[in-house]
């Protein structure tokens, strides 16, 4: 029986070298979901050998997760050639050309089938010696629905990227049904996977390229991205596109602003709420450190490593939250507040964790943020209370 199951080991093909950056200047207002869509256009142009290995998969949300440009260039996979009856319609933005060489697979409403397919596509490097770079997109609340089969695929050696977008209550203008709260915590707790929640387009570009570079190889790793449709002014991140900034982004976070001398309070934000965090810092004035978290997952690993658990590097903690700048900490995200609460343990500082603990509300974004107490005014109040308590 064993002989019948035996097979020759395939000659492995190394995955293509993934560039560190794509050279796009991220300016004006841009959401991370928009940056995600533009990423594929840039990848085809600047790194075609990488793009040739990319396979995207979506249930019924290819267009609404900004894969339209990629689909127009890569086509839909189909066993046989199919005619696109709307190809001559000038109002059709996405051309559903179906061919055996297509690199996007459309599944309909079937999230569990999607992640099962991601696992299989992500295992071709070990089974057939041919690495693929699979990326799946789903609305973020359905990450929970897809979690068990995707985690099983990761456990079995399938390396893939899952993008949950849009996410949080930031999509409140669309309604209350698709809001996600617990997914940041899911990302932190999933073995074999790194969770990312970038706030800015440049950070998304760097982290997604890095995630692609970790696929299709021994010792590789899957990735989960939590993105948003909320447009954010890119200038808020500063103009720093240096290698040092990139290393910090890939390590889990970086300072956007440092107070002169020791700060009175530190504000740490992640994802779509960074404009509110920075606005609050502007109101508070001098004496505030502002930190942009790109991966709570990596920072939590670093905290454990500093205590002697795991093999992760802990250097980012000294860069992001140095002991000589320890101050009361206010954390903010569009998700459950406990996902960033561990940061207070870095320097044993007082903590005020702000985030979303209820869902189902639809309305204007400013009103919804105020309702969930992740607006700038609430952040200012929390920072003042924390600072006063420390000085008192």
Regions found by a protein language model. Give the residues of each.
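Thiamine diphosphate
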Residues: 1-392, ...
């Amino acid at each position: 029986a064993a002989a019948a199951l035996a097979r020759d080991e395939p000659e492995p093909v190394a995955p293509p070298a993934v560039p560190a950056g794509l050279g796009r200047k991220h300016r004006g207002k841009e959401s991370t979901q928009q940056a995600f869509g533009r990423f594929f256009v840039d990848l085809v142009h600047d790194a075609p050998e990488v793009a040739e290995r990319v396979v995207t998969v979506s249930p019924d949300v290819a267009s609404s997760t900004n894969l339209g440009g990629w689909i127009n260039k890569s086509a839909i996979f189909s066993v046989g050639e199919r005619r696109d009856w709307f190809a001559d319609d000038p109002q059709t933005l996405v051309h559903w050309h179906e061919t055996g060489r297509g690199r996007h697979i459309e599944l309909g409403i079937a999230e569990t089938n999607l992640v099962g397919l991601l696992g299989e596509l992500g295992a071709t490097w070990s089974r057939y010696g041919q690495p693929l770079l699979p990326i799946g997109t789903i609305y973020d609340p359905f990450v929970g629905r897809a979690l068990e089969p995707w985690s099983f695929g990761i456990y079995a050696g399938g390396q893939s990227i899952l993008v949950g977008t849009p996410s949080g209550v930031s999509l409140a203008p669309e309604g209350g049904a698709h809001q996600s709260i617990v997914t940041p915590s899911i990302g932190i707790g999933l073995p074999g996977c790194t969770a990312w929640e970038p706030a800015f387009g440049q950070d998304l570009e760097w982290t997604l390229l890095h995630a692609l570079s970790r696929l299709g190889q021994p010792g590789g790793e899957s990735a989960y991205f939590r993105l948003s449709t909320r447009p954010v002014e890119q200038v808020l991140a500063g103009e720093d596109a240096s290698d040092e900034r990139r290393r910090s982004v890939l390590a889990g976070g970086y300072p956007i602003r440092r107070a002169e001398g020791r700060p009175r309070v530190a504000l740490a934000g992640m994802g779509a709420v960074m404009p509110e965090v920075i606005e609050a810092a502007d109101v508070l004035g001098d004496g505030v450190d502002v930190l942009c978290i790109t991966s709570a997952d990596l920072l939590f690993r670093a905290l454990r490593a500093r205590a002697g658990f795991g093999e992760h590097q802990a250097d980012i903690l000294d860069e992001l939250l140095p002991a000589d700048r320890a101050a009361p900490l206010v954390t903010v995200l569009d998700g459950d507040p406990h996902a960033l609460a561990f940061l207070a343990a870095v320097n044993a500082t007082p903590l005020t964790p702000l985030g979303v603990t209820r869902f189902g509300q639809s309305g204007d974004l400013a009103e919804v943020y105020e309702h969930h107490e992740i607006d700038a005014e609430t952040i200012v109040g929390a920072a003042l209370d924390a600072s006063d308590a420390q000085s008192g």
